[in-house]
Every structure is written in C-alpha cells, then in structure tokens.
Amino acid sequence: MLVTLAGYDILRGRRLLTETNASDFAHLIVACLFHDIGYVRGILNGDSADGYIVDAKGNKAKLPRGSSDAALLPYHVDRSKLFVMDRLSKIELLDATRVANAIEFTRFPPSHGADDSDSEEGMLVRAADLIGQLGDPHYLRKANALYYEFEEVGMNKQLGYASPADLTDLYPQFYWSSISAHIQSAIRYLNVTSSGRQWIANLYSNIFRAERELSLCGPQR
C-alpha cells in the first residue's frame, strides 16, 4: 500500500508540472497495486501443487517444503505481468500491456530492456516501488524480516549480508550507489507538494538513522 501511496504523491506533483490525464493516473496506480502480486501463490491458472508458473511459456518452479511467498522473489515480476495480462485484458479503460510494461521496471536490479528514456511511466513506477519501501518510517525495524526473506532465496549472500545488522549497516551505501539514481525524476515531482516532501524526509531520515546506528530502531548491532 505504501508503494501505491508514494505513486499517488508522485502523480500529484507531476500533474502540477506537466500534463497528466486520468488515464496516466489509472495506469500508474494499477501498476503500483499489482507490481508484487506475483509473490502470491495460486494466482495464475497453472499454479498447482506441482509448481508455480514462472514465465509465459508455462514453465514452473517447485518450491521446497516450508517455503514462504518470498521464495518466488526471482519470478515475481514475470508472474505479476502474467496476472495483469490475464485479468486486465478485458477491461476497456485499461491497457494491460501498458501496465505490464510499467511493472517490468520494478525488476531489481533493473533489466537491460527497461530504458528510462522509453517510458517515464515505468520509471516512475520503479521509483514508487523504491520510495514506498525505503521511505517507510518503520523500514529499519523491518530489517530482520527482510533479511530472512533474502536468505530464503540466497540473495543475502549476493548482497554481502551475513546478518540483519549488515542490512542496516550497509544501507546508506546501498542507497547512494544503487537507489538514488533511479528516483531523481520522482523526487522532483515529490518536492512540489507537502505530502511529497514528507516522503523525501522519510528517505533521508532512514539514511541518517542507519549512519548514526541509533539504538532501538532496527537489528541489534
């Protein structure tokens, strides 16, 4: 929900700076709402006890016993796009392909095909995804849960995290090296409204707290 709220505030700012119509609002908000639906098991017609659909060819991934929805992290973007194409294609006022293309931009690290120059809409959905997560006032408190989600698919090792404390210790570096460049256009739109500036303040507050190693706001360090 925070991602959708961030997307809405980005659109509010954009509307004050450039032409933004009802269709723009609808497609971006719907993309924000459905961008992570692929984590949910059983949403696609081919999902079954034998495995979960992971691509348009119908290939499946069988999850180990005891897995959570987080185990679908490597596939969730493709699953979200498949869900959108299946469920939204019959809605006249929405272009399912447009929504799916915007969701593609939420793949992280960004896919090579997701060129910011081709789709401002996709870039703003990506920014809403990042800002909604990292601008959460409780983001650092959620570090333990996030770490174990990463651990379930081995991503903690890829990112160099050996414990939840590493996630917060390395957060400022991660933000400036991997996040900041992808959200600058959205920051420009957020800076136009008071609610948008609150998102910016939240982002920098989390960086400040991680840098200062404030107690009681995240994993024991």
Kindly give the residue locations of the regions a language model identified.
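Short acidic, glycine/Ser/Thr-rich loop/turn "cap" segments at secondary-structure junctions
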Residues: 15, 58-72, 84
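Divalent metal-dependent phosphate-bond-processing catalytic cores, especially two-metal-ion Mg2+/Mn2+ enzymes
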Residues: 9-24, 34, 38-45, 88-93, ...
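Alpha-helical context
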Residues: 10-13, 56-64, 79, 122
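Active-site alpha-helix of zinc metalloproteases
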Residues: 27-31
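Histidine- and acidic-residue-rich, metal-dependent catalytic cores
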Residues: 7, 70-111
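Post-HEXXH active-site segment of zinc metalloproteases
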Residues: 43-67
